[in-house]
Regions:
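Short, small-residue-biased leader/transition segments that mark boundaries at the very start
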Residues: 2-3, 7-9
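Intrinsically disordered or highly flexible coil/loop and linker segments, enriched in small
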Residues: 28, 50, 191-195
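Hydrophobic alpha-helical scaffolding
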Residues: 12, 53, 136, 168, ...
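C-terminal subregion of chymotrypsin/trypsin-like serine protease catalytic domains
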Residues: 146-204
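An acidic- and aromatic-residue-enriched active-site/binding cleft used to recognize and process polar
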Residues: 66-68, 132, 154-158
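Extended, charge-rich low-complexity regions and/or helical-solenoid scaffolds
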Residues: 40-123, 128-129
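Catalytic nucleophile loop of clan PA
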Residues: 132-153
Length: 204
């Protein structure tokens, strides 16, 4: 009786047939697709031996390279290579509820309390690079030339959404959250310095 009154029961009842019937059928179908995909790819090599054939990198380790740089995708428009906490506060000041901030964030910004994570008098939040990324790269580490963590990739610019099919190094940019901002949120904003103390921070 208690279970029948649970709010989640209708959802469970709805998804049970899906799990028991649709999921197994989908897995069978996907196995068949994978089998014939191998035949298709082999056929392409035979029919078009001089063409470039791109590998399927899904579920594999990938590496890409690029530079930290902005872009000018259209005439009269230019994106700088980084954003700062100033921009977050500027969006908050528009009154749009999507950009709501807690008072502590505003206080730390007003005091420019950026700790050791500032670059000059700014706290970088995100930066862009000319790395060729794709769907599924969110969370991928972005490393400098020495292998030190610079940030975490999480998106592409709007003008880069076609890069799975055509990569334009002058237009396509991946978007990365700066690891210094992540550390600042942990250490200064959230007061979790004990977590940062467990890490080895590399400083130039």
């Amino acid at each position: 009786d208690t279970l029948s009154l649970h709010d989640a029961l209708p959802i469970y009842t709805f998804f049970t047939p899906f799990r028991n019937e649709i999921v197994p059928a989908y897995k069978t179908f996907q196995t068949e697709v994978n089998k014939w995909m191998q035949v298709y790819v082999e056929g392409k090599y035979v029919m078009f031996p001089l063409e470039k054939h791109w590998p399927d990198a899904n579920s594999t380790l990938r590496i890409t390279y690029g530079q930290l740089e902005g872009s000018a995708p259209t005439d009269g428009m230019r994106y700088t290579e980084h954003t700062t906490l100033d921009g977050i506060v500027a969006k908050y000041n528009t009154g749009n509820p999507d950009f709501e901030l807690l008072p502590r964030m505003l206080d730390l910004h007003a005091a420019k309390n950026y700790g050791p994570y500032a670059q000059g008098d700014e706290l970088w939040v995100c930066f862009t690079g000319s790395n060729h990324t794709t769907g599924g790269n969110s969370g991928s580490p972005v490393l400098d030339e020495n292998g030190y963590l610079m940030g975490l990739n999480f998106d592409r610019s709007w003008e880069s959404t076609m890069s799975d099919y055509l990569f334009d190094p002058n237009r396509c940019r991946n978007i990365v959250v700066d690891i210094r901002y992540v550390l600042w949120v942990m250490d200064i904003y959230s007061g979790a310095k004990h977590l940062v103390d467990e890490m080895t921070l590399m400083k130039e």
